[in-house]
């Protein structure tokens, strides 16, 4: 039987630079969706990914849904 509380959850990663820059030409910041294991990484996930708005590799932070 499957457990009611899954260990893998879907999270949203948002660009740190785009979310802080309110005066940018792009109305929304760049976002990625991915999964993480709740048991192995209980803290918020931080990854370095490519941002299409900034045109460079930036830090992406996990955000609340």
From Swiss-Prot:
Example of a GO MF term: structural constituent of ribosome
The question of whether Ribonucleoprotein is a record keyword is answered with yes
Tell me which GO cellular component terms the UniProt record holds.
chloroplast; ribonucleoprotein complex; ribosome
The highest taxon in the source lineage is: Eukaryota
- Name a single GO biological process: translation
Major location (coarse) = plastid
Among InterPro entries, the record links this protein to: Ribosomal_bL33 (IPR001705), Ribosomal_bL33_CS (IPR018264), Ribosomal_bL33_sf (IPR038584), Ribosomal_zn-bd (IPR011332)
Q: Name one Pfam family in it.
A: Ribosomal_L33
Decide whether keyword Glycoprotein is in the record.
Answer: no
Compartment annotation: Plastid, Chloroplast
Which keywords has UniProt assigned to this entry?
Answer: Chloroplast, Plastid, Ribonucleoprotein, Ribosomal protein
What family is this protein classified in? Belongs to the bacterial ribosomal protein bL33 family.
Q: What is this protein called?
A: Large ribosomal subunit protein bL33c
Q: What is the lineage of its organism?
A: Eukaryota, Viridiplantae, Streptophyta, Charophyceae, Charales
